[in-house]
């Protein structure tokens, strides 16, 4: 490709509304342009990267035995009504009517469509297992699209769905897809973790997220220092260690009129924060017990995903408002505690090991100090309620936990029979009777993968693609002052034709631009290998080579240039 025949839309300045590095660099590199909130045009440089990511995904999925299909973006409402998600899905689901007043949606996901397709096409257990995938546009009407294509309303996703007669068959395909995803992200050169995860609105049982580690990530990824354990913080089990110590002081009621938060209590009374507890009131699952207290240590954070799995707690978790709390307990939120509490309470495992702690007295402006379980208050139900923190023991007993930010780029689920039962997707079983199929689903955010690679691999000059496979071009030819030097132009043209004939994805910068501009643009878009042709060096029989990833520069004899490039690219 010649730059003179290419839409090369780089920007010198960073747009003011771009908050994260990937958004900034994708705009500056001429990969994307905004059209409306959460909607982007993909320009030639961006589409080249996108298609190369799709190629890797497609090749690895095919190797794993999946079969490609393509399903409509527009889906009839009847399928969503049949699955039950028409009423369950929130405003992210864009609904509309056609001119016949029939309801449709723009698909945020395709479980209903694929289940309908398979129940029509597959009739016998002999046709299973079956794993179908597509690479298709999705639309979710995000309330606040942000971070460029990282969280846009329209995006491209690879979604696969497998169908089985048994849980064992599903597990086998799930294990294959786990390895396929690992192969994809390794091939793309990404630093990632496969972590245990919550199934969320998709439903099902077992689930793993594939998280690219990056400081701009929205998720907290937890992993062990000494084992393969890794989990999303929502699912990571918090292990409480040690034993509860014997009381050392009598419980006392203290006036605390100006201490309505843990921070204020700690500061005003010089208390160790790990000797305080906080009490949070949430809605109960049982109408006879409409409010439930959740009690965690003062320096810990409530894990809402864990909490809503307790049978006493409403799912999804909902906090009670201050009016409800005041009416039932008699005090405001700043004075709540375990002593003399008139609603069911659940305490975190760490709290169960505490002694001589401080908590609200359920009287406005008062706290109890030196509270001890069993002596001053009966120990309530104990449950894992908190987020883990760095240094906690790993749940597998090996090492301690570290926490890093992550960007979710892939997610695999064991759906079970959630959709197949609702939509009566059956096959004839081995015994001749109808058998409800068991399902798995497996998604990769293709557009998000592009942004994640940039978040993880960049410098002050621009993008550094982690793999040559996904760079927009593999080699850049930069001839300095070519239009003033016949020798430079001739050599550059010959090299360009040779590389093209050998299948190298090469960009030839034939613009009438200053060398500094040409270098800056090629570094900005992240071309991994740059060949710089200057008249003086050419007279000496040498060509300059630059490696974008390592920063390496070297002079190479022009007679050996192709063999050296062959070694560096490994595919000439």
UniProtKB/Swiss-Prot annotation:
It comes from the Bacteria. Signal peptide: none annotated. The keyword Nucleotide-binding applies. One of its GO terms (cellular component) is cytosol. It is an enzyme of class 6 (ligase). Its main location: cytoplasm. InterPro entries: aa-tRNA-synt_IIb, aa-tRNA-synth_II, aa-tRNA-synth_II/BPL/LPL, Anticodon-bd, Anticodon-bd_dom_sf, Pro-tRNA-ligase_IIa, Pro-tRNA-synth_IIa_bac-type, Pro-tRNA-Synthase_IIa_type1. It is found in: Cytoplasm. Its EC number is 6.1.1.15. Keywords: Aminoacyl-tRNA synthetase, ATP-binding, Cytoplasm, Ligase, Nucleotide-binding, Protein biosynthesis. CDD domains: ProRS-INS, ProRS_anticodon_short, ProRS_core_prok. One of its GO terms (biological process) is prolyl-tRNA aminoacylation. The keyword Hydrolase does not apply. It catalyses: tRNA(Pro) + L-proline + ATP = L-prolyl-tRNA(Pro) + AMP + diphosphate. GO terms for molecular function: aminoacyl-tRNA deacylase activity; ATP binding; proline-tRNA ligase activity. SUPFAM superfamilies: Class II aaRS ABD-related, Class II aaRS and biotin synthetases, YbaK/ProRS associated domain. Consists of three domains: the N-terminal catalytic domain, the editing domain and the C-terminal anticodon-binding domain. Catalyzes the attachment of proline to tRNA(Pro) in a two-step reaction: proline is first activated by ATP to form Pro-AMP and then transferred to the acceptor end of tRNA(Pro). As ProRS can inadvertently accommodate and process non-cognate amino acids such as alanine and cysteine, to avoid such errors it has two additional distinct editing activities against alanine. One activity is designated as 'pretransfer' editing and involves the tRNA(Pro)-independent hydrolysis of activated Ala-AMP. Homodimer. May form a tertiary complex with YbaK and t-RNA(Pro). Belongs to the class-II aminoacyl-tRNA synthetase family. ProS type 1 subfamily. This is Proline--tRNA ligase. It comes from Haemophilus influenzae (strain ATCC 51907 / DSM 11121 / KW20 / Rd). The gene is proS.
